[in-house]
A protein has these predicted regions:
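N-terminal hydrophobic/helix-forming segments and targeting peptides
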Residues: 1-463
Length: 463
């Protein structure tokens, strides 16, 4: 090949590169530091309530204060508001007023899990169980025969909130039992999504009886007695509880080269933390920078703590009113990075990917012009001008990025909060970290992509 042809190819062809070929040692050192703090965020927030509480703890350490309606705000002020303990909005006030819009990064901090039912505890064949109702798009077979924790809150009749954490550290764990292969012939003939029925996702909570032989529900009684001893609760209190069953392992490096992170909850805390840390680490921005950490994305962003809630609008309107600005004027000049994970190309399951248009681990922040399913159903399809804007912002900041879709057209699909931000007349596009084994109890991401996500969030805030 002549030098002329080589130069022409380099100029005209797209040539994605592994991010490790594009960064220097200083960036790699910064990447490791960032990822260590991210792993701490994961371990401190295995539920949306825990994430919200830890977010507030970190924000207060950075000088953020609760926003009070009517506060006078000046450039550089740092405020936050918590919505019912499950979602958080933070803002760093910019030099320009909100008539020029805001630079928003929106993520979510809920993850697929198992929720306790209102009447969860029962005994069968001298075992005590807790019945669950799965939350979000899980693959049920992945949740059996793995160690589990129970986390959440019980709200007593008088309104007292009791925090529950069972299975942490060296504490005893829980498990959902599976069928042994010796007796699994019929189960093995079933499709994966039918092999473990939802009603069989019952966690094993104990087997030792309390009381005299011949008494009923002796194992259940011991479990309930232990819960009462530790937390002061009785069985009726489960009706006003939010108890979540989550995997009982912490975030860890993966691979001999430690280039990956394995953990529960990368979707979407990997983007939520990047949005948060990016906000912390910018100076006073030109436009007000807003970080939204929402709840309920995994079930459609519904409800008072989801992205469809008026909570976001109320917070933004309060900020606008403090500057005498119309909310709608602010929205039409704003930009939102819907920061949610995307599917990473997995060569073990190549048949469901369209390789030319997939995000890959270690190739940087993954932009998705549109998500949805099949004919882009349920997606927010960003226009070409928005994609060009994001390209420019990321390139100017030296962020390694890529663009792709989520699998083959008819293989499935997914959605994010992007459509709900776009419905508010806010220019919006999706971008996030490629994830392997998404929605499983133990997801995998690349450290380089995590770091580029963080740099990308900072670039958006500063744009």
């Amino acid at each position: 090949m002549t030098d002329e042809m080589k130069a022409k190819r380099e100029k005209l062809f797209s040539s994605p590169k592994n991010g490790y070929d594009l960064v220097d040692q200083a960036a790699l050192d910064a990447m490791e530091t960032y990822c260590e703090s991210y792993k701490q965020y994961l371990d401190n927030g295995k539920t949306e309530r825990e994430c919200a509480a830890y977010t507030v703890e970190l924000a207060q350490a950075q000088g953020y204060v609760p926003y009070q309606r009517g506060m006078s705000l000046k450039p550089g002020d740092k405020v936050y508001r918590v919505n019912r303990g499950k979602s958080v909005m933070l803002a760093k006030i910019g030099r320009q007023d909100l008539s020029h819009g805001a630079q928003i990064v929106a993520s979510h901090i809920d993850s697929p899990r198992l929720d306790f039912k209102p009447h969860p505890l029962y005994e069968d064949s001298d075992f005590a169980y807790g019945k669950t109702h799965y939350y979000g798009g899980i693959r049920k077979y992945q949740w059996v025969a793995v160690p589990l924790e129970l986390r959440g809150v019980v709200v007593l009749r008088d309104g007292t909130v009791v925090k529950v954490v069972l299975g942490q550290g060296s504490e005893p764990k829980f498990v959902i039992t599976d069928l042994l292969p010796h007796l699994g012939a019929e189960q093995g003939k079933k499709p994966l999504n039918e092999a473990i029925p939802g009603e069989n996702l019952n966690i094993l909570m104990g087997s030792r009886p309390l009381g005299q032989e011949g008494d009923s529900d002796r194992v259940k009684l011991r479990v309930m007695d232990l819960l009462h001893e530790k937390y002061g609760i009785c069985e009726d209190d489960f009706t006003s509880a939010e108890l979540e069953v989550v995997p009982a392992f912490n975030a860890t490096d993966l691979g001999l080269d430690r280039s990956l992170i394995g953990a529960y909850g990368h979707d979407d805390r990997v983007c939520g933390y990047a949005a948060l840390k990016g906000l912390f680490d910018i100076d006073v921005p030109e436009k007000t920078a807003v970080c939204m950490l929402a709840d309920k994305e995994e079930v459609g962003s519904m409800g008072v703590t989801g992205m469809q809630s008026a909570f976001f609008d109320t917070f933004m309107e309060d900020l606008c009113q403090s500057q005498g600005v119309s909310l709608r004027v602010c929205y039409e000049s704003s930009f939102c990075l819907s920061s949610d994970v995307t599917a990473a190309y997995d060569p073990n399951f190549a048949e469901v990917y369209e390789k030319r248009n997939e995000s890959r681990v270690n190739y940087g922040l993954g932009i998705c012009k549109y998500t949805g399913a099949r004919g882009k159903s349920g997606s927010s399809d960003a226009d070409a001008e928005t994609v060009a804007y994001v390209r420019r912002v990321l390139d100017n900041a030296g962020v390694v990025w890529q663009i792709g879709e989520m699998g083959k057209i008819d293989a499935g699909g997914g959605g994010t909060v992007a459509q709900y931000m776009a419905n508010r007349n806010i220019t919006t596009i999706d971008a996030g970290v490629p994830v392997l084994s998404m929605h499983s109890p133990f997801e995998t991401v690349g450290k380089l992509d995590c770091y580029m996500n963080y740099l990308g969030c900072m670039a958006v805030y500063n744009a």
